[in-house]
A protein has these predicted regions:
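Short, Lys/Arg-rich, polar N-terminal cytosolic tail immediately upstream
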Residues: 1-5
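Small-residue-rich helix-interface/hinge motifs
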Residues: 7, 14-64
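Metalloprotease/metallohydrolase-associated module, dominated by Zn2+-dependent proteases
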Residues: 44, 52-158
Length: 158
């Protein structure tokens, strides 16, 4: 198989693997906090990209953690992956996957930079994780925007 074909197949395989992994980590982040608050997970859908829970006792802090955990768990896993990256590896798949995996896992953090701006103009999507975080934590949308920019920039330079 020639190099270009291997690159294309590696690209598609990486995307097909990484997107479901991102969904599992994102929804898993929410689920971990819900479970730690005594909730019971009633649904966890990879294809629908959602999780549902019943019960649990949430404070303002744990509710804020619930909303941000969907973004933070994939970012933390991505950072760990980047730190463990083996530069000497020659596999085409490994190199393409190692480029896409952190990119796909951290790119949704950009929403944490966009939604605060929408929130400031009263156009934030209801039910969104960022909107829920701002409302439950009482954090300034500007602080959330700054945090998202710093986090994303830090991941780019890691």
């Amino acid at each position: 198989m020639d190099l270009n074909t291997r690159k294309i197949l590696s690209l598609f395989a990486s995307i097909l693997f990484t997107i479901p992994v991102y969904i599992i980590l994102h929804e898993g982040g929410h689920a971990l906090i819900a479970l730690s608050c005594g909730a019971r997970i009633t649904e966890f859908s990879i294809l629908g990209a959602y999780m549902r829970y019943e019960g649990g006792t949430f404070t303002a802090l744990t509710l804020s953690l619930f909303y941000i955990a969907g973004m933070l768990l994939p970012v933390l896993i991505s950072i760990a992956y980047m730190l463990l990256y083996r530069d000497a590896a020659q596999s085409v798949f490994y190199r393409i996957f190692s480029f896409l995996f952190p990119l796909i896992l951290t790119a949704p953090a950009l929403a944490w930079g966009i939604v605060p701006l929408l929130y400031l103009s009263d156009q934030a999507p209801p039910g969104d994780d960022v909107t829920g975080f701002i409302e439950s934590s009482g954090a300034s949308p500007w602080a959330v925007l700054l945090g998202a920019v710093l986090l994303f920039a830090g991941c780019l330079f890691l």
